[in-house]
């Protein structure tokens, strides 16, 4: 019989909060509001805690657990994965972080030309005992146009791509597409992969008529999220890749601050 080195006793008396596998690329299926499901490729991190008297964890068991559940990734399945990790690895805590690209088919505003746009999403969950802490993050590319630049210039205004990330905790199922719509409706204009000339004209003029600082976008997203009853807690981050500055502009808030108003 082969020696099990991981199961050797360790006498250094040091508890490890997280041990496991990182940056595992893996095919998964996620829920899609329009098409029911969507196939994508995720990057996963999976961890458990390690008692002070255990020398190592069993890395292969993380993959074995994932193999049982990879066909569909949703909050219910993630809870089952975490419970299985704790059981097979004899742990009190388990953590999973899943980041993946999510694609939507978008129509250009004038010509209706269709193209796919990529969004970045992630699930982060930790089970400590029987308590589950679960959050979802949705990041969307957006377009911002500077209100100050528009106000002080005789013509034109500096504008650029930006990104907005919403991290939230919810008591019910929330579609990724719902969060994307909230973000895009709060920007100067949305981003498109394919635009013909008539579309470019529309998007350019729409952004000019709807100037936004990153602060404006963050606040407008927060106001829309506040009306979304399914969401219990949220964090909004907006970063603009400034076209005329050597730095990015950034704004951040959480629902904790909003509740104090």
Swiss-Prot record:
Q: In which pathway does it act?
A: Cofactor biosynthesis; 7,8-dihydroneopterin triphosphate biosynthesis; 7,8-dihydroneopterin triphosphate from GTP: step 1/1
Pfam families associated with the record: GCHY-1
- Going by the record, the broad EC class of this enzyme is hydrolase
Q: Which Gene3D superfamilies match?
A: Urate Oxidase
Q: Which UniProt keywords apply?
A: Hydrolase
Which residue positions does UniProt flag as site: May be catalytically important?
146
What is one process in the GO biological process aspect for this record? tetrahydrofolate biosynthetic process
Q: Which reaction does it catalyse?
A: GTP + H2O = 7,8-dihydroneopterin 3'-triphosphate + formate + H(+)
Q: Which InterPro entries match?
A: GTP_cyclohydrolase_FolE2, GTP_cyclohydrolase_FolE2/MptA
Hydrolase as a keyword of this entry, yes or no, is yes
Give the record's family classification.
Answer: Belongs to the GTP cyclohydrolase IV family.
Stated role: Converts GTP to 7,8-dihydroneopterin triphosphate.
Record-linked PANTHER family = GTP CYCLOHYDROLASE MPTA
Q: What is this protein called?
A: GTP cyclohydrolase FolE2
Species of origin: Fervidobacterium nodosum (strain ATCC 35602 / DSM 5306 / Rt17-B1)
């Amino acid at each position: 019989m082969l020696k099990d080195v991981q199961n050797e006793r360790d006498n250094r008396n040091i508890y490890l909060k997280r041990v496991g596998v990182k940056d595992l690329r893996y095919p998964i299926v996620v829920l899609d509001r329009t098409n029911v499901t969507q196939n994508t490729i995720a990057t996963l991190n999976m961890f458990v805690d390690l008692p002070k008297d255990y020398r190592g964890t069993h890395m292969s068991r993380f993959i074995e657990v994932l193999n049982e559940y990879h066909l569909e990734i949703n909050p219910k399945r993630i809870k089952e994965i975490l419970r299985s990790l704790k059981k097979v690895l004899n742990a009190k805590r388990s953590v999973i972080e899943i980041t993946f690209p999510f694609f939507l088919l978008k129509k250009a505003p004038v010509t209706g030309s269709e193209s796919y746009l990529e969004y970045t999403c992630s699930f982060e969950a930790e089970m400590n005992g029987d308590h589950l802490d679960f959050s979802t993050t949705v990041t969307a590319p957006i377009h911002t146009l500077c209100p100050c630049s528009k106000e002080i210039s005789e013509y034109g205004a500096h504008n650029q791509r930006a990104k907005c990330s919403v991290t939230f905790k919810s008591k019910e199922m929330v579609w990724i597409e719902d969060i994307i719509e909230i973000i895009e409706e709060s920007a100067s204009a949305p981003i498109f992969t394919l635009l013909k000339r008539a579309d470019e004209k529309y998007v350019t003029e729409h952004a000019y008529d709807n100037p936004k600082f990153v602060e404006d976008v963050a606040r407008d997203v927060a106001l829309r999220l506040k009306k979304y009853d399914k969401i219990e807690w949220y964090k909004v981050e907006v970063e603009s890749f400034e076209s005329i500055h050597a730095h990015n502009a950034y704004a951040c808030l959480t629902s904790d601050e909003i509740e104090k108003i």
